[in-house]
Amino acid sequence: MGDEHGEENAANRLTLISIDLPNIRAQARTLLSNQKSASTEAEALDLISYAQMVDTNLGSWANTLPPNWSFRTAGMVHEMPVDLETAEQWPGPQHVYDDVFIANIINDYRVSRIFCQSVVLGCASWLAPEGNDPHTDSSCVTARFVTQQMVDEISASVPFHMSYDMQPMAKKLGQDESGK
């Protein structure tokens, strides 16, 4: 494993950035169940701004990580299976990481970004159900793009989590396939 204290510090910093996400999501859920008024519309715009600020902080967090926290593409499945539910491998890239801890923290980061985007999309669609609002249209495009990217990267990490052969640190430490 890399610098354990550095890894814990990065994980702690991610937690501090993400700590308000459940509250933000709860506020959005409550707001979106209310009738529209000038004050609730302003609140929705404020929630969008706040979720975008948290997302920006998450992106900044990712930019501070050392190079060994980045994934490497170990393989690519090009063929689209007939039935995704029974496919042996997910189509697309297969990412590997230095160890499972790092992969888990990176996926926590991705989920946090998805939560931010869900608030943006929820508030924007509540403000403009027809999708024609110059205040929120570009925010929606960005939110959809970021969400798709995060989902794709989480999906690309699944083979790493499911295959001992893709986990270099476990093998280096002499762990067997059961993690012992």
Spans of features found by a protein language model:
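C-terminal amphipathic "assembly/sorting" segment characterized by alternating charged
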Residues: K171-K180
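Central/C-terminal regulatory/activation regions of fungal transcription factors
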Residues: M1-A128, D137-Y164
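A phosphate-binding catalytic loop at a beta-strand-loop-alpha-helix junction
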Residues: Q167
